[in-house]
């Protein structure tokens, strides 16, 4: 089963049958329109390419416009691809949120909020050094980043200050609380990566 592309609306809470408050993220999943079907013969692998939403005509490039016209669909806000295994799709086909009606858990992928350049304490949860007792300059610095002559360098991947966020993040096995096909909404328990109105990819959980 493939996934779908949606938009993070925000968080709220609902109450279950026992009156317990459940925190949920609301994901709006408009119809995903098939723009290309990739086959083993033509592309070397099988996949389906989809778009969703809409884009102003003056924001669509000529190659994109031709691609959408060939598929016979309205220009969307982006293109996403899902690998397929035996499923049959046709150009212009619409895939809706109701495909998750029988799914218990999903994996959600999004782009995390960008935090800019951050230090080791915020970026890697390093402990701070002494506030007093002779320490006047090094309260939030990293400390040692390696050895001396041997190896005489800083190892790749060393946790240091740098850009935090604005990267692809996947949260696995989120419980599906409700599928509202009429309003094109999917409610999942807990939080998902990214800012409000950000695009997210929802797939059935691989570890379910």
From Swiss-Prot:
Domain of life: Bacteria
Sorted UniProt keywords: Methylation, Ribonucleoprotein, Ribosomal protein, RNA-binding, rRNA-binding
Post-translational modification: Methylated by PrmB.
Species whose genome carries this gene: Haemophilus influenzae (strain ATCC 51907 / DSM 11121 / KW20 / Rd)
HAMAP family given in the database record: Ribosomal_uL3_B
A Gene Ontology BP annotation from the UniProt entry: translation
Annotated GO MF terms: rRNA binding; structural constituent of ribosome
Official protein name in the record: Large ribosomal subunit protein uL3
Cross-referenced PANTHER family: 50S RIBOSOMAL PROTEIN L3, LARGE RIBOSOMAL SUBUNIT PROTEIN UL3C
Subunit structure: Part of the 50S ribosomal subunit. Forms a cluster with proteins L14 and L19.
Keyword Secreted in record: no
InterPro entries the UniProt entry points to: Ribosomal_uL3, Ribosomal_uL3_bac/org-type, Ribosomal_uL3_CS, Transl_B-barrel_sf
SUPFAM superfamilies recorded: Translation proteins (SSF50447)
Top-level taxonomy: Bacteria, Pseudomonadati, Pseudomonadota, Gammaproteobacteria, Pasteurellales
Family, similarity comment: Belongs to the universal ribosomal protein uL3 family.
Leader sequence residues: none
Physiological role: One of the primary rRNA binding proteins, it binds directly near the 3'-end of the 23S rRNA, where it nucleates assembly of the 50S subunit.
